[in-house]
Amino acid sequence: MHALSGFSLVSLLSLGYLSWDWAKPGLVADGPAEAGDQPSVAPPQPPHIIFILTDDQGYHDVGYHGSDIETPTLDRLAAEGVKLENYYIQPICTPSRSQLLTGRYQIHTGLQHSIIRPRQPNCLPLDQVTLPQKLQEAGYSTHMVGKWHLGFYRKECLPTRRGFDTFLGSLTGNVDYYTYDNCDGPGVCGFDLHEGESVAWGLSGQYSTMLYAQRASHILASHNPQNPLFLYVAFQAVHTPLQSPREYLYRYRTMGNVARRKYAAMVTCMDEAVRNITWALKRYGFYNNSVIIFSSDNGGQTFSGGSNWPLRGRKGTYWEGGVRGLGFVHSPLLKKKRRTSRALVHITDWYPTLVGLAGGTTSAADGLDGYDVWPAISEGRASPRTEILHNIDPLYNHARHGSLEGGFGIWNTAVQAAIRVGEWKLLTGDPGYGDWIPPQTLASFPGSWWNLERMASIRQAVWLFNISADPYEREDLAGQRPDVVRTLLARLADYNRTAIPVRYPAANPRAHPDFNGGAWGPWASEEEEEEEEEEEEGRARSFSRGRRKKKCKICKLRSFFRKLNTRLMSHRI
C-alpha cells in the first residue's frame, strides 16, 4: 500500500494534478539554511540552470515593488537571492528572446524592427549558435516549455533544431490560454500548441500557465539530477488575451478596473506556477545545485492592465517603462545573498554568464554583445558592462522633427534609437508613448482609464537623461549638455557601422494555417526561401514564364498580404 501511494504521488505530480494543491504554506522557501553573505560551497558539477521568462509583466507588477498584486513566491525567491535593480531588457517580445538566446544586439541579428509575425518567412539567424546549443556542447540536457516567438517558417527554425532536446509550447506571439488559437488578422487563424515538431491537439483545453508548470515538473521528475539540466520556461502569461481561472479572479473581486483585475489574477497564477516548479526542484534533488533566473521580457502593456509605475512609458517604447526589467537570481550557490544589486545587466549578458557557469567558453569569435556578469551578481563585484545599445531601427525613421543636421551631422535624429552610456541615456526619433501612468485601479468604462495614457506633445527628436540621478526621465538635459549628446550620437554611429541589414520580409500567403491542417507551422523549404529572397530583391523576372504562370495565384495572394501586412498589421504586437 505504501509503495502504491509513493507511485501515485510521483505519477500525479509528474502529470500536474497534484502540483497545484499545496499542503503546506511556504514550501518555496524550504531548503538549506542560508548564511547571508557567507560563500557557498562550490558545486560538485555544473549547476542546473532554470530560466523563467514572463511575458508583458510590468515593473510595478510584483509584490516587492509595492504592487497591489500578490506574488508571494517571487517576493520570497527574490528576497533570498539577488534582486537586479539595474537590469534591462527589450521593449517587445521577439527582440528580448533573440538577445537572450544569441547574446547579440538586434543590430547583429537583423531583427531590429518590430517582431517576427506568424506569416513572415523569418526566424532567428540559422548561422548563429544559440545558448542551448552551447549548453549542449557542455554536456547539458536542454528543455524548453512555453512561448518561442523566434520564427518557424522552416523546420530548421524550430526550437528542437536550435538546441532544445524537447519543446512544448507555442510558436507564435500570443494564443488563447485554453484553445491555443491565434489569429494573424481577420480570417487568418490557426491552432498553435506544439510538442516537439508535432501539433499537440490533445492538450487543448488546459490553461497554459498550469500546463507549462506541469510539464516543467514532469521534466524534473524524469531527469537524473546528477546530469546538468537547462530548463527554459517562457510563460505566455501575462500577455493578452486577459484570461484567468475563476479561482484567481475571485481574489481580486474588489479591484475596480476589469482589465487590471484579470491581469492581477494571471500574475498570481503565474506566481503559483513558479512555486510549483521550485518545489519540484527540491522534491527531485536539483535545488542545492541550481541557479534560478527570473526575468520579464519587456515592459507592461498599460492599456491591458499592466503597470510600470513610477517609470515612464510602457511596452513598445524605449522609455524606462519599456526596457527596465524585472529580474532576480535565486540560488544556494550565490556567495552574497539577500541583497539588491545595482550592477548594470542586460538580457544579452545571460548567454556568456550561463555558458561560463556551465563550464563552457566564449570568445570574440562568437560575436557576443553580452558580458559574463556572474561575479557581479554572486559576489557583488562591479559589472563589466558600462553601456547598452537599446536598439537602432532604421526602418522606423519618421520623426517629423528629426534630421541629420539636428544630429550635428553625426546621426539622423529621425531614426528611432536609444543608448545608455554610463549614467547617460540618449533617445532619438520617436521613442513611443511617454507618459507616467499610475496603476489602473479606476473602474473601467468606455473612455475612462485608458485615456490616462496620452501621447506626449513631441516637438523634438533628441532626449538626454542622467538615468542614475533621474530614473523616471523627468528632466531632459539635451539642451543643457550638447557635449554629451554629441558623444552619444557618435557612439550610435559607431554601433550602426557594425549593423547587418534588417530582415523584415512581407507576409507569405502559404503560411496560412488552412494549408497546414488548421495549425500554425513550418511551410517553406530552403529552396523556397531562396526563391522568396530572389523575388524580394527584384529578381523574380529571371524565373521561367511557365513557372510564373503555375504560381499565379500564389503571387497575387502574396502581393495582397504584403499590403495587408504593411497597412493593417505593422503595429500589432
From Swiss-Prot:
Binding site for Ca(2+): 55-56, 93, 297-298
Amino-acid positions noted as binding substrate in the UniProt annotation, renumbered to this chain: 147, 239, 315
Gene3D superfamilies given in the database record: 3.30.1120.10, Alkaline Phosphatase, subunit A
Signal peptide bounds: 1-23
Glycoprotein among keywords: yes
InterPro entries: Alkaline_phosphatase_core_sf, ARSB, Sulfatase_CS, Sulfatase_N
Post-translational modification: The oxidation of Cys-93 residue to 3-oxoalanine (also known as C(alpha)-formylglycine) by SUMF1/Sulfatase-modifying factor 1, seems critical for catalytic activity.
Co-factor binding details: Binds 1 Ca(2+) ion per subunit.
Active site: residue positions: 93 (nucleophile), 149
Acidic residues: bias regions: 525-537
Family: Belongs to the sulfatase family.
Biological role stated in the UniProt entry: Displays arylsulfatase activity at neutral pH, when co-expressed with SUMF1; arylsulfatase activity is measured in the secretion medium of retinal cell line, but no activity is recorded when measured in cell extracts.
PANTHER family: ARYLSULFATASE, ARYLSULFATASE I
Protein name: Arylsulfatase I
Organism, as annotated: Mus musculus
